[in-house]
């Protein structure tokens, strides 16, 4: 399968545009009121400093680095997100496969890039969203009880892989771009999760694991597994 690049050369993710604009207007407005409305400037200096720090953290959260996987993608599974590996185990998957699968989970802290990439090349076979709870994303039951979206992909070699985006205690919005029937490729964005979350990848049993527990991952760069 030929790899189709549909990248946009942006440095901030589109999901953050409205939030950053509204936040900038509010912070500037409040700082202006403090500067012009209060004779003592100490509150203004304190709030202005805090505003800059908070806004820079928001910009950092919505940053969108442009990454290209430079190697052959055949049978390769790349990390769909920045973060760290919190689960590597065989589990019974009941929502789509209804069989036993190898699950690799990546937890994203609030300081990680929150754009999500497709973990494999292939065709999108199924997309679904489930409403749910907002427990801490690293808890095992968050995978099946929290709000989540699943994207099932069939690779050119016939393997079926699922990527599940999971909302956490802070993350309250999952954005998924995948559509059933469309081709998808490593290097393309699969979606975005706002403010702390997790992504589970479900793979066929016998898949070679290329990461270890606690290992840091870089989305679209770290190879987490190789399909047989």
UniProtKB/Swiss-Prot annotation:
Post-translational modifications reported in the UniProt record = Is synthesized initially as an inactive proenzyme. Formation of the active enzyme involves a self-maturation process in which the active site pyruvoyl group is generated from an internal serine residue via an autocatalytic post-translational modification. Two non-identical subunits are generated from the proenzyme in this reaction, and the pyruvate is formed at the N-terminus of the alpha chain, which is derived from the carboxyl end of the proenzyme.
Q: Where in the cell is it found?
A: Cell membrane
Q: How does it sit in the membrane?
A: Peripheral membrane protein
- Identify the domain of life: Bacteria
What's the catalysed reaction? Answer: a 1,2-diacyl-sn-glycero-3-phospho-L-serine + H(+) = a 1,2-diacyl-sn-glycero-3-phosphoethanolamine + CO2
Subunit relationships: Heterodimer of a large membrane-associated beta subunit and a small pyruvoyl-containing alpha subunit.
Query: Its Gene Ontology molecular function terms?
Result: phosphatidylserine decarboxylase activity
According to UniProt, residues marked as the site described as Cleavage (non-hydrolytic) are: 196-197
Q: What is this protein called?
A: Phosphatidylserine decarboxylase proenzyme
- Which residues are responsible for catalysis? 197 (schiff-base intermediate with substrate)
Look up the signal peptide feature and give its range.
Answer: none
What's a single GO CC term here?
plasma membrane
The cofactors named for this UniProt entry are: pyruvate
Q: Which Pfam families match?
A: PS_Dcarbxylase (PF02666)
């Amino acid at each position: 399968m030929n790899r189709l690049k549909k990248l946009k050369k942006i440095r901030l993710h589109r999901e953050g545009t409205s939030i950053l604009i509204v936040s900038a207007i509010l912070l500037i407005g409040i700082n202006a009121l403090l500067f012009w409305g209060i004779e003592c400037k100490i509150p203004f200096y304190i709030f202005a400093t805090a505003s800059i720090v908070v806004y820079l953290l928001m910009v950092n959260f919505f940053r969108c680095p442009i990454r290209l996987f430079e190697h052959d993608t055949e049978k390769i599974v790349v990390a769909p997100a920045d973060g760290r590996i919190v689960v590597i185990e065989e589990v019974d998957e009941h929502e789509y496969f209804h069989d036993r699968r190898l699950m690799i989970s990546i937890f994203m802290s609030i300081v990680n890039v929150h754009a999500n990439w497709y973990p494999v090349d292939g065709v999108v076979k199924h997309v679904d969203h489930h409403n749910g709870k907002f427990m801490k994303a690293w808890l095992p039951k968050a995978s099946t009880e929290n709000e989540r979206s699943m994207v099932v992909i069939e690779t050119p070699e016939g393997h079926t892989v699922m990527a599940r985006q999971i909302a956490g205690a802070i993350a309250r919005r999952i954005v998924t771009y995948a559509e059933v029937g469309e081709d998808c490729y490593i290097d393309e964005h699969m979606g975005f999760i706002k403010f702390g979350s997790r992504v589970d990848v479900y793979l066929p049993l016998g898949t070679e694991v290329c990461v270890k527990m606690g290992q840091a991952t870089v989305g679209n760069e770290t190879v987490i597994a190789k399909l047989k």
